[in-house]
Amino acid sequence: ASGTVATASNLHVYFHDGTSILKYVNATTTTPITIANLTTGTQITDVPAAATTVTVCGNIPAGTSLPTGGTVAALKAVQLEITSQSAVADVVLSGDDKPLQTWTTGSPALPYAPGITDGDKYAEVEIGPAVARVEIEGLATTASSAVDGFTLEGIYVNNFFEKFNLAGTVVGTKVQYGATPAAYAQGQGLYTPANAGKLFDQSAVAATGIPKEVIPPTAGQRWAYQVVPNGNSTDANEQLQLVFKLSNLAAKAGSSVNFGTGDQFITVRGFK
């Protein structure tokens, strides 16, 4: 739904020296150090003096193996499927690596760390979604449009990457279906039934009202897709795209427009 805030179901805290993981803390709602503790501020003991940096990630999908030791590079190389990010509650959370700073009495004021003492180390880490979310409220004609009616057959994500890693970069080859009309249908490529609502939606909804409009079948919901950046290319054929497949396009009387027969496509790109 619109306006939904991502929340954490698990958090993973790594203390390291930039190369090696020196201490790992897992936080859920039931662990000794809970998510609520980390949210409001808490003391973590036995952090090695050699630790200089803290890294936090969260909402790691079930079945994904995270290291509890080893190298930071191995942690950042952990790969995730974009289809695992289909719901707000599933969105992976991450933040920038933050340095551990030494606290001197009274400077700065740390209301979230009442037990901190002179010489202790602290870090403030902000985390947010590791992927971008594209929401579609609906598709409608304008008053000046020559369109008098249409059916939205489906919405398809194109020019996307299947995987990303905890370093925030894409992995593998970009998935591109190009200008082949038959590619945009359930059962083609990665547009499988299991990926419905993740990489595409296909519902054949007829436009109604004046102006003609199509909205998601469930009130208060939006068509939404999680994506990862696919580069800063200015080439329209390389940018992330949403492809809208329309049928039954009808022109207003007297418009002199002929849409022809068969499906028609609208491609939206230029996402920032």
Q: What spans do the regions from the language model cover?
A:
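Tryptophan-paired
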Residues: 3-72, 110, 133, 137, ...
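Extracellular beta-sheet/turn segments enriched in Thr/Pro/Gly and aliphatic residues
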Residues: 76-129, 137-139, 268-272
